[in-house]
Amino acid sequence: MLASDGKRIRVKEGTPQGGSASPLVANVYLHYVFDLWAQAWRRKRAHGDVIVVRFADDIVLGFQEKADADRFRAELTERMRKFNLELHPEKTRLLEFGPLAIDSREWRGEGKPETFNFLGFTHICVMKRSNGRFTVLRQTIRKRLQAKLNAVKAELKRRMHEPIPEQGKWLQAVVRGHIRYYGVPMNNPALALFRFRVGWLWHRALSRRSQNGRVLWDRMRRLIARWLPLPTVCHPYPLRRMIPTPTTWPTYQTLGWWFSTWLGLWT
């Protein structure tokens, strides 16, 4: 490891926090510690269907059988211990999720299925009003949305005296990048809220620098329409392209089974 004073330090374990190589090294490490082991466990020890999704150190697993989820969690805890790793006690949880979860929890009087956060989205079980079919609603995590708005507010303060076209180009890139990541079906309200709040922050910044008082909203609406992109869906529903469908199962049946699972969330 190269220290800030230029000295080289030999590190026997772990990776330096904040180092450019740390995510790469950690990902390679988890590939052998978790990925290969989880795939082998799914093939040899699972009784029902199992899906595994990992991004860096955030992992979501879906189980058709709750017994599989319980056994996997216990064995994963033991395996992590062998490599001096541990599951996050607050972020590791098991929850019932899917179309059958809605009916079974309602029958037991337990209310709606729990939600979970993954990759910036809150995942929610819902039934569409248009056709009554089950779908997974993905909404921008509120804390992430507010954190981004706080960052925009701070940067606008720094850029307060820049020409409006320069501010507009920067805000355009910010809003477009946000939409390109969070632009999924049924997340339009959160996208529209982000765009509206960015426009409101911009209006406040321009009003503070104006010698004539507040900028009129008629002018501000034209600036917003000129520079801030409208919300749009950039990523269609991933179910058909992401879920492996055995040739002997109809597509609708496959989707029902995959999301009639107990989800174990590990970090």
Feature-to-residue mapping (PLM):
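Non-catalytic terminal/accessory segments
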Residues: 1-267
